Design a protein with these regions (language model features):
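Gram-negative and organellar
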Residues: 1-260
Length: 260
């Protein structure tokens, strides 16, 4: 599935981060470690080297470990600032999870328009191994981000193709989010994610996933020790659509709130 289920409980999260620059600000080191309920651990580390005003290279590592799942991600990339608005980049990724691993190469362009509107175009290709299955992947995506002092909107469209000896899948994914600060004390966020997967071997859609979510945070400026958080989520997953007798259709409503 393209959309993974999240942990919708409000848990205690501890985060420690470090950022330092060296050699007259040409080298930057950033790292962050977080743990949730002293069980779920995440580690991020990255080094950026600025060769000149236009060209930089970077490498990074990410590690996540949950109760029943872990992942490792290693990246090496470089970026060239073509002008004040356009930058080009390439990136190599090595991903490893419990039952899968991938070697992917990405090529992209970032375009900034009037400072508050940015557009990203990305193409990705590589090899993926899941269990005993090996297949190739190609993906192209377009991401638009619009930012103002009081709100932020992000929309992403992605087309992904996985093909090999045992599968020939097309997947269409859209990811959308909005955040709006109605006042210094109140913020609203919303997300909408949707994906559909088609199997060309049988010329049929085999999976659909949708997730809608709205959340809010209330932290009075005059009483900053008080916090009220809330979230409503609707999830709909349809799997194994190729066989009616074994198809699954899951619909879930989740409401969570917390005050302190």
């Amino acid at each position: 599935a393209a959309i993974k289920k999240k942990n919708y409980d409000y848990d205690q999260v501890y985060t420690l981060g470090v950022s330092q620059e060296f050699l007259k600000n040409k080298v930057k080191l950033t790292s962050e470690y977080s743990t949730t309920n002293n069980q779920d651990d995440r580690l991020r580390a990255r080094i950026d080297v600025r060769a000149n005003d236009r060209y930089s290279i970077y490498t990074g590592y990410e590690f996540s470990e949950l109760d029943t799942w872990s992942s490792n991600k290693f990246v090496v990339g470089n970026r060239y600032q073509l002008n004040d608005q356009v930058s080009l980049y390439t990136e190599s990724q090595r991903l490893k999870e419990r039952d899968s691993k991938a070697n992917l190469q990405s090529y992209g362009m970032d375009y900034s328009y009037k400072g508050n509107h940015s557009l990203n175009l990305s193409y990705q290709e590589g090899a993926v191994k899941e269990g005993k299955e090996d297949y190739d992947r190609q993906a192209i995506s377009v991401t638009s981000t619009y930012t103002k002092p009081l709100f932020r909107v992000m929309n992403k469209l992605e087309y992904r193709k996985d093909y090999g000896q045992t599968q020939d899948l097309d997947q269409y994914v859209t990811t959308n989010s909005i955040a709006y600060k109605t006042s210094p004390s109140f913020r609203i966020v919303g997300t909408f994610d949707y994906s559909i997967t088609k199997d060309h071997r049988i010329n049929q859609n085999v999976e659909k996933n949708a997730e809608y979510e709205i959340g809010w945070a209330y932290r009075p400026v005059t009483h900053n020790r008080f916090n009220w958080l809330g979230r409503y989520t609707y999830i709909e997953n349809e799997g194994n659509l190729r066989a009616i007798d074994s198809a699954t259709n899951e619909k879930t409503h989740i409401f969570a709130t917390e005050g302190s």
